[in-house]
């Protein structure tokens, strides 16, 4: 974590290194996310590890998966520059959804966000901390979905002074460890066990 932080952050300090290390742990694995499934499908065909990891990299590149923290970073940046309420309103107006909020697995807050939020709070000055707290409160008042790990990661990148695309880098580096474990696990299963069927549907 120390070497990675030194390359991504302009002023790496011990608190930031601890936060990045925690993020790497939190992001290493999360059940059968789409990129993890891609790795396991490749492993089921007995592709070698490097090819299976390439399958995961292709999927994680999507803005709704590994790149989602970049959109959340933009929301946090806009909340700082425009104010939380205006940032929320304009994001919903143009994107029709709030990046960094909602997750298919969790009904409420993503517990990974909760951990990252605590670490971000330690890095931010009180006035910047209040901006994120206000954004969260406004989202709650509007009954929007709870915050997810992408918001936590985007906020961490912002607090660290990192570039907005560093979240994707951190996410991918962390997830490679999890993918490798899934790859090895899949090799113990029956080969080519993922075979979906399709039903042809004509127009009425």
Regions found by a protein language model. Give the residues of each.
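Hydrophobic alpha-helical bundle cores within soluble ligand-binding/oligomerization subdomains
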Residues: 1-204
């Amino acid at each position: 974590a120390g070497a990675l932080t030194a390359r991504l952050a302009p002023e790496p300090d011990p608190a930031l290194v601890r936060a990045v290390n925690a993020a790497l742990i939190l992001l290493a694995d999360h059940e059968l996310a789409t990129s993890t499934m891609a790795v396991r499908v490749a492993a089921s065909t007995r592709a070698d590890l490097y090819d299976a990891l390439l399958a995961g990299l292709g999927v994680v590149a999507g803005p709704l998966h590994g790149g989602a923290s970049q959109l959340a970073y933009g929301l946090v940046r806009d909340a700082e520059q425009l104010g939380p309420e205006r940032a929320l309103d304009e994001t919903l107006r143009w994107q029709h959804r709030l990046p960094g909020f909602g997750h298919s697995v969790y009904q409420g807050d993503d517990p990974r966000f909760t951990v990252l939020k605590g670490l971000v709070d330690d890095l931010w000055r009180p006035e910047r901390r209040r901006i994120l707290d206000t954004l969260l409160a406004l989202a709650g008042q509007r009954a929007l979905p709870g915050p997810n790990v992408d918001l936590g990661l985007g906020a961490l990148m912002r607090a660290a002074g990192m570039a907005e695309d560093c979240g994707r880098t951190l996410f991918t580096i962390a997830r490679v460890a999890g993918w490798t474990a899934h790859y090895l696990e899949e090799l113990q299963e029956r080969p080519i066990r993922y075979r979906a069927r399709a039903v042809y549907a004509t127009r009425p």
